[in-house]
């Protein structure tokens, strides 16, 4: 397996759109994804395995603060360190902190974020729909990155 992490570009759009539709109840539209390309605040990375888009991570940086929008890996590529590699690569950006929301029931993701140093800092009640579920807010500060 040869994995590469690359900046999200037009050539990755089909693969990232497939990941969105496979992994999320409310996937971002192709247009929403395409709009991220070239934005100064948008830092999207794509992981390819043997040339195929296997996962991606979206991060918005505003005023030195990072907000994770999406982390997803196709089921057939999970448990191979792809999501962790994407997160650790994003941590190289200069930010005072990075924060994200994750479904309470998404124990594999919570475990991954904890492994990467994120801490549970709160709950957003009924943040998700389909199904309705609370979000756990997780954050990592610059000194912990």
How should these model regions be labeled?
Residues 2-5:
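Extreme N-terminal starter segment of soluble prokaryotic enzymes
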Residues 93-104:
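Conserved GNAT acetyl-CoA-binding A-motif
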Residues 32, 124-125:
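Short, P/G- and charge-enriched loop/turn segments at secondary-structure junctions
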Residues 70, 74-88, 103-111, 115-116, ...:
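Conserved glycine-rich acetyl-CoA-binding loop
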Residues 7-76, 84-93, 141-145:
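Acetyl-CoA-dependent GNAT
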Residues 103-107, 116, 126-145:
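C-terminal "cap" of GNAT-fold acetyltransferases
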Residues 56, 121-123:
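Residue-level detector of high-confidence beta-strand sites
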Residues 70-72, 99-101, 137-139:
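Short aromatic/hydrophobic contact patches that present stacked aromatics
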């Amino acid at each position: 397996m040869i994995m590469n992490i690359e900046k999200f570009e037009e050539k990755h759009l089909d693969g990232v759109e497939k990941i969105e539709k496979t992994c999320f109840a409310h996937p971002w539209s192709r247009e929403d994804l395409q709009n991220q390309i070239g934005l100064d605040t948008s830092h999207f990375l794509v992981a390819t395995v043997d040339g195929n888009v296997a996962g991606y991570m979206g991060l918005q940086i505003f005023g030195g603060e990072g907000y994770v929008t999406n982390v997803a890996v196709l089921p057939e590529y999970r448990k191979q360190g792809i999501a962790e590699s994407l997160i650790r690569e994003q941590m190289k950006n200069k930010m005072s902190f990075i924060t994200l929301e994750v479904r309470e029931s998404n124990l594999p993701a919570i475990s991954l974020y904890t492994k990467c140093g994120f801490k549970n800092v709160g709950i957003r009640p009924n943040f998700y729909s389909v199904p309705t579920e609370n979000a756990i807010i997780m954050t990592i500060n610059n000194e912990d990155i």
